[in-house]
Amino acid sequence: MALAAVKWAISSRTMLKHLFPVENGALYCVGHKSTYSSLPDDYNCKVELALTSDARTIVCYHPSVDIPYEHTKPIPRPDPVHNNEETHDLVLKTRLEEKSEHLEQGPMIEQLSKMFFTTKHRWYPRGQYHRRRRKLNPPKDR
């Protein structure tokens, strides 16, 4: 198995040397396309292949091609007045309405007072009168 892998590596290296001839210098660019390409012919890039001088690395250069303005299309913008589709605001409003229906505080406070054997007043928030009288910066202990 290992012998077959070594033979394949050697044969692929010699094959690459024949496909991409190396001249003096570190890199030689080949101007022709390879016979096999997974990209369609009208794809917007020019592919150039190169092989380094030590024949260990294949370099692929594919800059994107500029597309003429005549071949582009504008982004469709729907009319906001006559658009019947759901907008982001409508979706948020419906979600908030659904959440507010589930948050009823009446039975929740009664259930809490029965569970912990307390009065209902314990579970309501403290009023502004009590919050105002609380010291904001209590003195530190010595």
Swiss-Prot record:
Q: Which organism is it from?
A: Bos taurus (Bovine)
What gene name is given for the protein in this entry? Answer: MRPL42
Q: Which Pfam families match?
A: MRP-S32
Regarding protein family, the annotation reads:
Belongs to the mitochondrion-specific ribosomal protein mL42 family.
* Superkingdom of the source species: Eukaryota
InterPro entries referenced in this protein's UniProt entry, alphabetically: Ribosomal_mL42
Q: Which UniProt keywords apply?
A: Mitochondrion, Ribonucleoprotein, Ribosomal protein, Transit peptide
**Subunit details for this protein?**
Component of the mitochondrial ribosome large subunit (39S) which comprises a 16S rRNA and about 50 distinct proteins. Component of the mitochondrial ribosome small subunit (28S) which comprises a 12S rRNA and about 30 distinct proteins.
Q: Which GO terms describe its cellular component?
A: mitochondrial inner membrane; mitochondrial large ribosomal subunit; mitochondrial small ribosomal subunit; plasma membrane
Would you tell me the protein name for this molecule? Large ribosomal subunit protein mL42
Instruction: Return the transit peptide range from the UniProt record.
Output: 1-32
> Where does the protein end up?
Mitochondrion
PANTHER family attached here? LARGE RIBOSOMAL SUBUNIT PROTEIN ML42, MITOCHONDRIAL 39S RIBOSOMAL PROTEIN L42
